[in-house]
Amino acid sequence: MNFLAHLHLAHLADSSLPGNLMADFVRGNPQGDYPAEIIDGIYMHRRIDVMTDNLAEVKEAREWFRPQTRRVAPITLDVMWDHFLSQHWAQLSPDLPLDEFVRYAERQIVPILPDSPPRFVNLNQYLWSERWLERYREMDFIQRVLNGMASRRPRLEALRDSWQDLDTHYDRLETQFWRFYPQMMRLAENKQL
């Protein structure tokens, strides 16, 4: 899961949106560094990551990547799940349009930025102003995201080429998304994540 899915599941679970979004920028034990609700959100994010990585549907999808891109498949798939969520948002969350949800999430997160890790603050400078969460529905933007990550981290250079795997297996990946994401939503709504 990437930014949009973590925020969506946090919302469904009545969990901290800031904590869930911030989790990838917090190393180790967050106890004592943040308020309890943010810590709970950080831990929820971590549980979702472990659960998603171990889903049969996700493991199967990783195998569709070519040997030269399989190492970065988990990262590529996280971004792709956000693409499908953004694209099918109206069907998955009909009572709350995506643009309204994004504004709601931004209002929850921006106030905590002064007490946040610098890299998280930096992310937020672009996430909201460039409307990343809404733009995930555009495959051109997904390619830009993968290229951007590859540019910032040379060891992730294979992300650029993983675009071809997404293009080749697009329909199969979409089917996988529908096989697991609605279940994740139910778990969130039932406070089981």
Swiss-Prot record:
<dbReference type="GO" id="GO:0006633">
    <property type="term" value="P:fatty acid biosynthetic process"/>
</dbReference>
<dbReference type="InterPro" id="IPR007431">
    <property type="entry name" value="ACP_PD"/>
</dbReference>
<keyword id="KW-0275">Fatty acid biosynthesis</keyword>
<protein>
    <recommendedName>
        <fullName>Acyl carrier protein phosphodiesterase</fullName>
        <ecNumber>3.1.4.14</ecNumber>
    </recommendedName>
</protein>
<dbReference type="InterPro" id="IPR023491">
    <property type="entry name" value="ACP_phosphodiesterase_gpbac"/>
</dbReference>
<dbReference type="Pfam" id="PF04336">
    <property type="entry name" value="ACP_PD"/>
</dbReference>
<keyword id="KW-0443">Lipid metabolism</keyword>
<dbReference type="GO" id="GO:0008770">
    <property type="term" value="F:[acyl-carrier-protein] phosphodiesterase activity"/>
</dbReference>
<keyword id="KW-0444">Lipid biosynthesis</keyword>
<keyword id="KW-0276">Fatty acid metabolism</keyword>
<comment type="similarity">
    <text>Belongs to the AcpH family.</text>
</comment>
<keyword id="KW-0378">Hydrolase</keyword>
<comment type="function">
    <text>Converts holo-ACP to apo-ACP by hydrolytic cleavage of the phosphopantetheine prosthetic group from ACP.</text>
</comment>
